[in-house]
Amino acid sequence: MLFAPFISYMTDITPTSPEEGEVILLNKPLTWTSFDAVNKIKKSCQIKKIGHAGTLDPLATGLLILCTGKKTKEIDSYQGAEKEYTGKMVLGKTTPSIDLETAFDAEYPTDHITHEALMKAVQQLTGTIEQFPPIYSAVKIGGERLYKKARRGEAVEIKPRTVTVSLFEIDDSHFPEIYFRIVCSKGTYIRSLVRDVGILVESGAYMSELCRTRIGKFWLKDAEEIEGYVARKRAELGLSS
């Protein structure tokens, strides 16, 4: 396999009082929003103060960090941490959202695309780069989320952002499906990288799978399933099942 196995660092997360709070590592399920996860934990475990440290799109899975109580003060530090993702893009088609949230809107040829062309595209997208966020994103323009404007069909001017992609590996052995592993800075949109790969190889691309495997020192391998966390926490708190 192209990708090296993930290393799991032991964390120092231990049970604490509700006031002190805790850092919760969850594996976000497919189709759930980050706020779905927050609300599930908040209501099921009767937690007053809780927030998440970085949004995951509904069609993405993987590591989601929640902080409760006084630990919510640490959210900013986790949001700013380096992120790692694995996923799959498919060449030859595009969607407005660059993933499967929206229907295909165009098809492109792929016969001309070589391994060398793909590697060159990846190299161009590695390092400190200027990136345009997707129109279907939570970026705010004029006080409103871009995805709301997109769903109304409203045209907006999107400004590029400076982000850092420190690692961009691909496996094109199942072409036109391309598996990838990316390590990047805060604010990087993986869908934008996928879109730009398609453009650079003179075709189109969309993302069919995405999983966040790491946030800073925290790894998906150490995360709990949401229902498992809820059951364990309710038992700790003496709440009825």
Question: Where are the regions a protein language model picked out?
Answer:
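Catalytic/RNA-binding core of pseudouridine synthases
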Residues: L2-S241
